[in-house]
Amino acid sequence: MVFFRVTNSINIKITDGTILKYDRFKAPVGLENETIYITTYDDFKDLQDIFSKVDKNRYLAKILNEKSVKTNPNFPTEIGISFENEYKIKEEFKDNIFFDIKPSSLLYSLNSFHKPIVKVALIGSLGSTISDMISSMAALRIFYEELKNIYSKVELDIFIKASNNSYYKRDKSIYETQKYINGVYPLAINSKTICKYDYFVDNSVDISKMLDINIVDAWLYKFGIDYKKIPSSKKYSELNCEHFELSKGLSQKIIDAKKRGKLLLFHPYSATINKSIPQNFAIEILKGLIDKLDDYVIITTLLIDPKIKSDNYIDLSTYSKTIEDFIYIVSSMDKIITAYTSALHIADAFMIPTLCIATFKDYEESLKYYNYTKTIYVKDSSKNLSKFIYENDSLTINKFEEWKKLKIEDIIKTLEIF
């Protein structure tokens, strides 16, 4: 986490319309103070960029000594692995490998056993992508349940990056699918507010990017929980969509589609190009599914090929406008075929049989707790003849050789195993 003050008062409007107020610093540091702010490293850097664009001489965010702020006797107790002096380490070394990861114990971190009710603040998101956040929900739920074994009531709030986060509304919606989360708020948090909590967890450093283990296990380790002692059967995510406000017409579109047959979502593209199904092959797979699966209605939320028209094919790309729309669509499916995308993680939360076409070697570790997923691995057999560090597609050979071996019959056969 980063502790800082601002040189002049300023208001910032974030993407959902919320106004964040930053007031000019007033001493002292060691007491509850509405002008001392705490946020994640990434959010702090975004804030610095905003200040620089407004007036780089008038508006500055200046680092404070975190130990001085934490001397306040009312400052909450930290749970889990600590990353002190994060700003200094990242500015000097530019790499997370220089952090000293010291194992922590959740039980030994606690000190308010006499209280029936405790408040916990999580500072920062559990990852930045939809896939990371939804996967990590399993660890967050287990963390909450472990606390509930000790306290009669646990109020869990999460504060997420907001200063220049175009996905703030999306990220907030994802966390609001968790019934055990009390509230989702934008960063930064001031020291007066954080002192109302009993405990805090510093998620500014993404622990899952530092440990070569499954993302659920990584976050359990971060929370001070021995992931090896948690049964695999408990490492699942849940998504509550009862409160969703869907785009107009989407619900009826799904109802009408279900009357025509079983629904199969085909979702070939990831935000990471190397995890996506190449476009030409995605189009051919889509055509094959439409042609060979008469008892299914094929659904997409991506405009794969506007020229494809069929009675058993529905393109919902104009209806899938928000993360809530997309989660609802995925939750309505009977089966799913996808690349390694957020659809995979959402589907497992709803126990929907899913075929993942994976393109990276460590997919087994990533999917080890997904009981409703089958996988076809497409190996990257490409070779780059360029002698330079940068990639040159014109000098890459065999790039699609393994994709050419992937047959629609093999995809359908694997799908029918469920």
Task: Please describe what each predicted stretch is.
Residues 2-418:
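Catalytic machinery of carbohydrate-active enzymes
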